[in-house]
Swiss-Prot record:
Reported function: Transcriptional activator that regulates the expression of genes involved in aluminum (Al) tolerance. Binds to the promoter of STAR1 and regulates transcript expression of STAR1 STAR2 and ART1 required for Al tolerance.
SUPFAM superfamilies, sorted: beta-beta-alpha zinc fingers (SSF57667)
Zinc finger (C2H2-type) in chain: 229-251, 281-314, 319-342, 347-371
Encoding gene, per UniProt annotation: STAR3
Any one Gene Ontology BP term: response to acidic pH
Tissue: Expressed in roots.
Domain of life: Eukaryota
GO molecular function term, any single one: zinc ion binding
Biased composition (Low complexity): 136-148
Record's keyword terms, sorted: Activator, Metal-binding, Nucleus, Repeat, Transcription, Transcription regulation, Zinc, Zinc-finger
Motif (Nuclear localization signal): 386-390
Protein name, per record: Zinc finger protein STAR3
Chain segments carrying region Disordered: 130-173, 254-284, 372-400
Subcellular location field: Nucleus
Amino acid sequence: MDRDQMTNTMRDQAANLTSMNPLFYPFMADDALLGMAPPPPQQLLPSVSIQHMDWSPDTMLDNLTFIEEKIRQVKDVIRSMAGRRASSSSAATPEQQLVNADLTCLIVQLISTAGSLLPSLKNSSFLSRTTPPPAAAAGAAQAVSLAAGESSSSARNNETNREDEEEQMGSPDYDELFKVWTNGGAMDECVGAAGDEQDARENPAAAAEEEKYEVLQLEEDEILAPHTHFCGICGKGFKRDANLRMHMRGHGDEYKSAAALAKPPPPPEGEEQPPQPERRYSCPHAGCKRNRMHASFQPLKTILCVKNHYKRSHCEKRHVCGRCGAKRFSVMADLKTHEKHCGRDRWLCSCGTSFSRKDKLFAHVALFQGHAPALPPPPPPPTSGRRRHKQEEPEFTWGGGGGNEFLDVKGIAGVGSGSGGGDEFFSAGSFGAMDFGFGQLDASLAMLLPSEQFAGDHQEENGDK
């Protein structure tokens, strides 16, 4: 009798607890439960070989304790931030940054710890998707309901709740949630998004520039090709499109019209053209900063830039300066620029540094204290013995052929000898008394001269006669 009363008391307590908490599992004898439900299949048993897939209450308790501690720390940090904001000052800016960093670290730890709880819940025995068959579950639920003194309607409600829970755990959203947290995808996604945002904040111009243009990469043969435009009839190549259009005139009258020689017409203004992204070019050389696979990629703007960059950086320097013989270039334009100042007297500083331009020398002198422009070298000392001073003797160009043929007047008799130094050879008196009509010219110009000067000149002429 005492045993029956004890059993009835346990049933009443179980019924009260069940009504208060739907998740409460009623106390029953183990043999009664095992006898009412069929034995579960082998694949439904908890895993024994894989330890981390079993539910560990100790691990979950430690994680929950850790989460509670971090939540308390987050609350303290937020309270301190609120207090500092009330008494804000300019000196508290570094402290505010440190507090923000601490808060970010705490939140990341909370997220990672909460993610570690989800796999253990999924693989536990009471949340596992490998649930008993519906018949066994229904039998066990009915037995528990009868043992607790519940009616058949409450048993059907419990069965319906369990089916809803199973359906919720079998939904695709539930699987995706566990997959993301188990594989660490959520943390990687958060970290990756934060890294992209940080790169965009650090270099917003580069991030915006990458979206504006498309990158094209030419091959080495295309870059080093001497011609880029070719005739479709004879196959002759040209460097410029204008040269090709002029060449096409020789292939027929249809290429001589103004429309054929003009540039391609632009699209009409009325039609809306789809926005075309700007083109940028990449260097085909692997490891180059101008290659699109480089971390610090810097694109090239035009095809000419690609050609010059590739020749200067990755090709042999074949063009040699003919003046100094030391400088070598791979681009002909660079050689021509060098030849403009090669061989000229360079501006020298007292420190030994030479410059091609005077303004660069003075900028160097102004930058470094104690430096000064170097003085020109002194003239060579005079030679010992008697120095002979040679008179400069005139040389006259003979002929107009442009050659170096000169008429040497030193060999002519009477030139260079005597006190006159050859002046008498070219004097007007050597031609004799010949009148070329200068007298008449003087008479005609007498009105332009003063009367005294003209009279004196006329008397001198008469006296000479």
